Amino acid sequence: MFLQCLSTASAKNSLDLNDLPAFAEKYLRIQDKQMRTVALRLNSIQRRFLRERTGRDVVLKARQVGISTVEQARMFWRARTGSVSTMTLGKDEENKTRLRLMWQGFRDNLPPELQVKPKYDNAGLITHSDTGSYQVMNVAGPNG
């Protein structure tokens, strides 16, 4: 259902479903530093990361440049446009919750015609009943 609605919307707006930056700007919303809900417009570092990532990347000390945001957006986009299993590890419970709320914000701020109620939606698991995708959220380390 989501893909059918998205394909219809894409055809009307000439939006390439393989183009994460365009998808993000059109459909994904985040909270900015002033706590306003705004469109996700990828910055130059985020775009470069998407272009050059290998799939085996480890990002060290990349704070405040948007890597967590672009990775959550990429996983959400992949979960909504195909069938994938993704995992997010937060450094602690607070970080995991913040990342989970970002994912929830992506979903809750989609246009109504693109929203799909998840089969499961709790602190550790979000499923997408229409694509079969799921997102596992946990805490890294011995307490996770």
Segments from the language model and where they lie:
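Phosphate/NTP-binding elements of NTP-utilizing enzymes
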Residues: F2-G144
